């Protein structure tokens, strides 16, 4: 199991060989100081993981997260910690996990105004074809919000996907929008 260190809202894998291994299992994390690696061979620095990635990898048994006091944070404790740091973490994590389990590569979508950028092949191999916004199925979305989501995805030539999370059934449903010129 790979040793990872919790540092605020990030998790660091200091060992470069272990960083390369984790990256190779599904394009997880970002190598510090390397902007666009083409593959695992380009991972020559420690890897920085988001909390969502870290919770997922901890649940899978791929990483062991250690806090500043040297305590190992098991999946449940790391999930609880992340819920306090990230707004709507439970919704975001449910979507992240569902997409990963379906075989997609899921990265942060912040630069696209979304929760996630989703790849079928991986970053460095293609541009993300989808941007995903995670929403509680019971939450109302105004027409204005929907248009603003669409504007971002259209200007970046990505398909907008709303991921609707039903907390009761723990299911995720997806609605994809394709914008057309008329």
From Swiss-Prot:
Active site annotation, chain numbering: 119, 127, 158
Catalytic activity: pretRNA = a 3'-half-tRNA molecule with a 5'-OH end + a 5'-half-tRNA molecule with a 2',3'-cyclic phosphate end + an intron with a 2',3'-cyclic phosphate and a 5'-hydroxyl terminus
Organism from which the protein derives: Saccharolobus islandicus (strain M.14.25 / Kamchatka #1) (Sulfolobus islandicus)
GO molecular function: lyase activity; nucleic acid binding; tRNA-intron endonuclease activity
Name of the protein in its database record: tRNA-splicing endonuclease
Keyword Disulfide bond attributed: no
Entry-linked Pfam families: tRNA_int_endo (PF01974), tRNA_int_endo_N (PF02778)
Keyword entries, A-Z: Lyase, tRNA processing
Function: Endonuclease that removes tRNA introns. Cleaves pre-tRNA at the 5'- and 3'-splice sites to release the intron. The products are an intron and two tRNA half-molecules bearing 2',3' cyclic phosphate and 5'-OH termini. Recognizes a pseudosymmetric substrate in which 2 bulged loops of 3 bases are separated by a stem of 4 bp.
GO terms under biological process: tRNA splicing, via endonucleolytic cleavage and ligation
Uppermost EC category: lyase
């Amino acid at each position: 199991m790979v040793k990872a260190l919790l540092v605020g809202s990030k998790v660091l894998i200091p060992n470069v060989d272990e960083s390369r291994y984790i990256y190779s299992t599904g394009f997880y994390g970002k190598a510090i100081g390397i902007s666009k690696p083409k593959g695992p061979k380009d991972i020559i620095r420690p890897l920085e993981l988001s909390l969502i990635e870290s919770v997922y990898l901890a649940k899978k048994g791929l990483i062991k997260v250690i806090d500043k006091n040297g305590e190992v944070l098991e999946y449940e404790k790391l999930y609880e910690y992340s819920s306090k740091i990230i707004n709507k973490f439970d919704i975001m994590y449910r979507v992240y996990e569902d997409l990963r389990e379906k075989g997609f590569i899921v990265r942060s979508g912040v630069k696209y105004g979304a929760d996630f950028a989703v790849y079928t092949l991986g970053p460095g191999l293609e541009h993300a074809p989808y941007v995903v916004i995670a929403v509680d199925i019971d939450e109302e979305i105004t027409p204005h919000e929907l248009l603003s989501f669409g504007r971002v995805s259209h200007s970046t030539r990505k398909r907008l996907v709303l991921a609707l999370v039903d907390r009761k059934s723990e299911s995720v449903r997806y609605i994809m929008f394709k914008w057309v010129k008329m």
